[in-house]
Structure formats: structure tokens, C-alpha cells
Amino acid sequence: MMKTLRIILAFLLLTAAGGLQARTFNDKVLNRPYADMRKWHLGFSVGMYVSDIRFTHNGFITPEGQQWRLDQPGYQPGFCVNGLFDLRLNNYFSVRFTPGMYFGSRDVRMVDVDGDLTERQNLKSTFVVLPIELKYSAMRWRNARPYLVGGVMPAFDVGKKRSDFLQLKSSDIYLTVGFGFDFYLPYFKLVPELNFCFGLSDVLVHDRPDLIDDPDKFKYTQSLTKATSKMVILTFYFE
């Protein structure tokens, strides 16, 4: 969670720096005054993200008397790239489609509650995401314009490999909410954005016929009722 806070702090610092730069331009000239009047906006983004997986336990106890708890002990930043297709509805609202790819991994720790046994598993993912969002922009203040954004993000894991202990589903859908700033530079718009994504479905595969002959590995899945995902995403759009 500390890394997430650092990302948010870095976003605020970068936004403040961008605001100072925009104010410098504000005192001289209004950059790209008709940019927001276009019906379509195209662009791309690069960024980073951290993901978290939350486990709901059911109190399962193995025949040996073991009770296992699973958690994600740390966060590993991932990398993401997106395209941008923005359809203007009116002066304040637009609809965005930002397909992209996310590359990352998550470490999962399995701990025996009453003993000192510990197992670990690294879950690597390559997501194809298809976010559709509604963007609300406030009034432009010279060369800066804040906005809010929200929507849904279907995600498909195309790089998922067979897992020894846990196996996650290849698709999920996220509810997204975020905010950002349009900074109008002389030749393009720079748009830093912070987005929070909340997985809506159980991503744990409960039916594991591949482990029918290895119940010692299946016990981790048996210990869980469900698993849900969350993401915090920091992106920089160029329009």
C-alpha cells in the first residue's frame, strides 16, 4: 500500500509541476484554443499500475488439521500502453474508448495459520483491456482543465499460464473511476490521469480437475470463497 501512496504522491507532484508550466504559458498565450471543439480526439498513453488481489476465506481445515490463509504481501508495478478514441458529446461531456495492454505480476503468499509452513506463487499476467468511460470536464482555465472520468473496463488475460496452486480466470470486468488534468501545450495536450479500478467478479477458478490427483495443492483453492482484483493506474495521455 505504501507504493500506491507513493504513486499518488508522484501524480500530485507531477500535476503541480504541470500546473506551474501551464501557468507560465497562461501569462503569454492561450495554447490550442479550439482543440476541444473537434468532434473526435485521438491519442495514446503510457503508464504504470499496481494491482491487488483480495481473498475471502471460508475457514476450511484440511484432514491434517491445517488452516491456510492467503494474501498479497507486496506490490509490483506493471507497465501499460493504451490508444485513445474520444467522442465529444458537448462542451463538458465526452465518451472515451481506450484499448490497451497491461503487463505485470502479483505475488501470493500462503501461510499455515497454526504452523510455520509458507508457500508462494507468482501470478504473471498480460491483459488486453477495453475501457469505455464517460468523461466530465470542468471549464477550461487558460491552459489547464481538470476532469473526472468513470466507466467499465473489460480485461482479458492472454498470457495466463497453468498455475501450480491457484488458477485465475482469463477475464474480469472492472468498475473504474478517476480524475486528471488536460494541460494545453503549444503542439499537443499532456494529460496525466489517476484511475482506480475495482473488479466486479470472482476471478478464482474453483473447479480444478487437473489437481484431482494432487489434493495437497488443491487445499489452497478449497480455503477460499472468492478472489477479487483491484488496480491503481497512473497514465500520461498525449493528444
Where are these regions (language model features)?
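Short conserved catalytic/interaction loops centered on acidic-Pro-aromatic/His motifs
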Residues: 143-146, 162, 166, 188-191
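Bacterial Sec-dependent N-terminal signal peptides
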Residues: 1-27, 236-239
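Predominantly the C-terminal beta-signal and adjacent terminal strand-loop region
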Residues: 29, 186-239
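Transmembrane beta-barrel outer-membrane domains
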Residues: 35-39, 70-78, 121-129, 166-174, ...
